[in-house]
């Protein structure tokens, strides 16, 4: 298998790195769901993009905000 993208993510993120698909997510409480990442904004949460808001935002198996 060799080097994974998670290694690159670890190098890029200082605290708690987390690899989701091809995107790197940084920050405390970083969590990746099976539907990849969630995009947290002031008006909601969208799956399929890296998280840009609160770290507490998570996506369930149906790719919807919970």
UniProtKB/Swiss-Prot annotation:
Positions bearing N-acetylserine: 1
Report the induction information: By cadmium.
The residues that hold Cd(2+) 3 are 20, 24, 26, 35
Residues at which Cd(2+) 2 binds: 13, 18, 32, 35
Quick one: which residues bind Cd(2+) 4?
Answer: 38, 51, 57, 65
Which positions does UniProt annotate for Cd(2+) 6 binding?
A: 47, 59, 63, 65
Question: Keywords on this record?
Answer: Acetylation, Cadmium, Metal-binding, Metal-thiolate cluster
Q: Which InterPro entries match?
A: Metalthion_mollusc (IPR001008)
Q: Does the keyword Metal-binding apply?
A: yes
Q: In UniProt terms, what function does this protein have? A: The metallothioneins are involved in the cellular sequestration of toxic metal ions and regulation of essential trace elements.
Note on domains (UniProt): 14 cysteine residues are arranged in C-X-C groups. These are thought to be the metal-binding sites in other metallothioneins.
The family classification in the record reads: Belongs to the metallothionein superfamily. Type 2 family.
Q: What is this protein called?
A: Metallothionein
Species of origin reads: Arianta arbustorum
């Amino acid at each position: 298998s060799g080097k994974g993208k998670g290694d690159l993510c670890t190098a890029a993120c200082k605290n708690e790195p987390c690899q989701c698909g091809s995107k790197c997510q940084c920050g405390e409480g970083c969590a990746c769901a099976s539907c990849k990442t969630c995009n947290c904004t002031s008006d909601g949460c969208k799956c399929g993009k890296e998280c840009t808001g609160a770290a507490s935002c998570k996506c369930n198996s149906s790719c919807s905000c919970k």
